[in-house]
A protein has these predicted regions:
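Juxtamembrane transmembrane-helix termini in multi-pass membrane transport proteins
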Residues: 1-54, 114-135
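Short hydrophobic "helix-edge" motifs at membrane interfaces and signal-peptide entry regions
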Residues: 1-2, 98-100, 145
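Hydrophobic/aromatic residues within the transmembrane alpha-helices of Major Facilitator Superfamily
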Residues: 5, 9, 39-40, 74, ...
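Membrane helix-loop-helix hairpins that form the core translocation module of multi-pass transporters
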Residues: 25-94, 142-153, 159-165, 172
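Selected transmembrane alpha-helices and immediately adjacent juxtamembrane segments
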Residues: 83, 87-112, 118
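Hydrophobic alpha-helical transmembrane segments of multi-pass membrane transport proteins
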Residues: 134-143
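Juxtamembrane boundary at the C-terminal end of a transmembrane helix
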Residues: 172-179
Length: 179
């Protein structure tokens, strides 16, 4: 949960939260949309991690997970920019817009990759999905409520460095825990 919450700060989905909150000013459907989209996306990612866990020998898995965590550590240092331009909500409203936008924004994102890695490492699909989803909500719900005024004061560079160090430490521990 902490890993995903820290990795999410300054991420494109957090920027998406900020944009949705500023544009539509409807926190409840936005947060519910984040919850539903994240549960769906991270369930798929976690299932992939479980499949990888079952497929690979423990030593091979350890090296892949450790190397992947180190790669995510490097990736965490790169700031995200939100490329999507949101249009007016569909006839289904802000909730559906948020679900679709978040699900798509999470594809191939750091937190989705982290979910795959954590599920492969811990072989506990439900706990990983719940934990990563809570991490997403911890990072995004305050942004929805605080809007741009509070988000402008967050030291994103320092948080990215902290997230990178956390992923690097997890990667190194994973690689060398057998020794």
């Amino acid at each position: 949960m902490l890993v995903v919450a820290v990795a999410e700060v300054g991420d494109k989905t957090q920027l998406l939260s900020l944009l949705l909150a500023a544009r539509y000013r409807k926190p409840a459907p936005i947060i519910l949309g984040i919850l539903v989209a994240t549960l769906a996306n991270h369930s798929v990612a976690g299932a992939l991690g479980e499949w990888i866990h079952a497929l690979l020998a423990p030593d091979v898995l350890r090296w892949i997970v450790g190397g992947s965590l180190l790669a995510v550590a490097a990736w965490a240092l790169k700031p995200d920019k939100l490329d999507a331009d949101l249009r007016a909500p569909t006839r289904y409203g802000v909730f559906v817009l948020t679900c679709v936008a978040f699900f798509l924004a999470e594809m191939g994102d750091k937190t989705q990759i982290a979910t795959v890695i954590l599920a492969a490492k811990y072989h506990a699909l439900a706990l990983v999905v719940v934990g990563t989803t809570l991490g997403m909500l911890i990072a995004n719900a305050p942004v929805v409520y605080l809007g741009s005024a509070g988000a402008n004061r967050i030291p994103f560079r320092a948080v990215r460095i902290g997230a990178s160090l956390l992923f690097a430490a997890m990667g190194l521990v994973t690689l060398f825990m057998a020794y």
